């Protein structure tokens, strides 16, 4: 395995771990049992990629290579055990830790999986289709989290929190442009970092899209 392939593998696993952890935390907050925590963690980690692969007419990568499901399940189990044996510690700080960990895990997963969605589209032969590549990147980035929130019966994170899906779209478009001009490695690294930066700035400066609050009724 060359250095570039190793970097991509580590990024892919990091995104899997981050999204699995976010799914497990949501499940714990919804008071699901161990099985529910693991299922939600796995679905969050591989859900977006499976949706992408179905659109591309391919067997989902998570089914062809079980390491992603295994890593997601192991991460979910570890998160469950940490919360289980440190219940008193986390209960006293649940809101602070929940928001912080969700922000970090979701942001990392979003950045990495967005560019890997673009990568999958390029590998499938759609380098010239900017719209499709951006769509695949965004779907891969937000799909797992959307599935997680629907299964947990909570308002989808991508619709109610600081700029989220828009960060994924921007990162996907940038990734496509970098792919064509500078190659795969710069596109994936810079593209993922751009998503993470936009998410950080959105939270730091409270960027939100307009919404109807109901006060004008």
PLM region spans:
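Glycine-centered tight-turn and secondary-structure capping sites
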Residues: 44-48, 140-144, 148
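Alpha-helical transmembrane segments and their membrane-interface boundaries
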Residues: 1-46, 50-130, 157-163, 168-217
